[in-house]
Design a protein with these regions (language model features):
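Short, extreme N-terminal segment that most often corresponds to the first beta-strand
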Residues: 1-45, 172-175
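Hydrophobic beta-strand residues in large extracellular and virion-surface proteins
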Residues: 5, 57-59, 87-89, 103, ...
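Secondary-structure transition/turn motif
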Residues: 8-10, 53, 142
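Short acidic, S/G/P-rich loop/turn micro-motifs used as interaction or catalytic elements
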Residues: 11-12, 92-99
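Well-ordered, non-membrane alpha-helical segments in soluble/globular domains
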Residues: 17-20, 97-109
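Conserved short hydrophobic interaction patches
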Residues: 22-27, 106-114
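Short, intrinsically disordered low-complexity segments
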Residues: 29-94, 132
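Acidic, proline/glycine-rich low-complexity IDRs
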Residues: 109-175
């Protein structure tokens, strides 16, 4: 299962990769030994990948400035979020249920670090959640699987206040 987390960041992407590694280690400190976490930094491709039992994340450090700007404008026009870093998330299917909970904890820690915009997307047309100018919105117009993933008990793992919002309705489309 593929997801994408896009965020605004003033950090260099290398520093953001290190920060994500530290957050993941903090979230999983009681569950994993450090030999279960694999970090790759391919110098020739300038790509950071962090993989472990539940999911892997990757950040492309080679993105050109014009690509980043086009991507930023697209997210601003489509979702109303100002982001400049794209983080790909690949879940391991057999551990998705636990991995999703761990990712929510990681996202919660990111939310508390700064007030930058953020959006989390799956393969649907509308994001699962987004933060705009410090306010977190959870999509209330979800399919059955998404509703299970975004239940109130699971969202408590974010440890961050949020409002529910129908992203489909608020985008001018009918359900």
């Amino acid at each position: 299962m593929d997801f994408r987390l896009s965020t605004g960041s003033n950090l260099p992407r290398e520093a953001l990769g290190k920060l994500l590694y530290d957050i993941i280690c903090d979230v999983l400190v009681m569950e994993l030994s450090f030999d279960e976490i694999e970090v790759k930094d391919w110098s020739d491709s300038r790509h950071i990948s962090i993989g472990f039992t539940y999911f892997s994340i990757s950040i492309n450090l080679d993105d050109e400035d014009d690509y980043i700007e086009r991507y930023r404008k697209l997210n601003l026009e489509t979702y109303g979020v100002d982001t400049n870093v794209d983080i790909n998330i690949q879940f391991i299917a057999r551990t998705f249920d636990i991995g999703w909970l761990k990712l929510l904890e990681v996202i919660g820690k990111l939310l508390r670090l700064n007030d930058q915009d953020l959006v989390v997307e799956d393969d649907s047309s509308y994001p699962l959640l987004k933060r705009i100018k410090g306010c977190l919105f959870i999509n209330s117009n979800l399919d059955e699987f998404q509703t299970e993933c975004m239940g109130k008990e699971k969202l408590e793992l974010l440890n961050y206040p949020y409002l529910e919002k129908d992203f489909l309705k608020d985008n001018g489309h009918e359900k």
